[in-house]
Amino acid sequence: MAATKQGGGDDGRCARGVVLERTGARMGAERVALLAAIGRTGSISAAAREVGLSYKAAWDGVQAMNNLLAAPVVTAAPGGKAGGGAVLTPAGEKLIAAYGAIEAGVAKLLSSFEKSLNLDPAEVLRGLSLRTSARNAWACKVWSVAADDVAAQVRMRLGEGQDLTAVITARSAAEMRLAPGSEVLALVKSNFVLLAGAGVPERLSVRNRVRGRVIERIDAPLSSEVTLDLGGGKTITATITRDSAEMLDLHPGVETTALIKSSHVILALP
């Protein structure tokens, strides 16, 4: 777990906020405050109000943390407009405690260095921070790499007995030094995720078939965002047409399969 100082203030110094990073998961003050509020209230909606977030932003934050950390920090189920019940796990409690201790230590350390630095630490850290528009991001462990002169097939554990395969260039695999046991981030845009109804044909060119249960569906006039629970605190989100969501009768509780082409899986190092 690494710690960085977050965002600079108007005086050019680092603001007193720490971002914890573990396997690519960014845990800033806002998300840690959200975790603490969930622990106090037992509700995502109540916690969101307490820290000044929308319910959607809070729920997305919980999903992101659970997907990117080794163990879920919150066990929760969305409850529509009324919000849902939520329980802070032991892993979540440890993260809050670690954040408090590291924040105090980093604040003391950086305050002693800022006066002698010739550049703004906040500016440097902002430049080094990874940001991605991919809706789905998971921390995975590589268990197999098969490469030829052009391409490499990388197989990873997604959790709960489910695997994910990515096909990348052989050069990228070599530069990333991917091997069994490597930890990577797997990124997939939500519009690259297809959802299938019952009876998925065996003969499909789509390599990845991830089983899950619908836990949330948000409808817009033309599109729908559907989130599946994959087990183990992991989720996957797909953006499909609203007509497709209605045709497949995708509502909370329905079991379905997410289909992802291996070429649509992007890998990054944590």
Curated annotation (Swiss-Prot):
Keywords: Molybdenum, Repeat, Transport. One of its GO terms (molecular function) is identical protein binding. It comes from the Bacteria. GO terms for biological process: molybdate ion transport. Residues 131-197, 203-269 form the Mop domain. It holds the Pfam family TOBE. Belongs to the ModE family. This is Molybdenum-pterin-binding protein MopB. The gene is mopB.
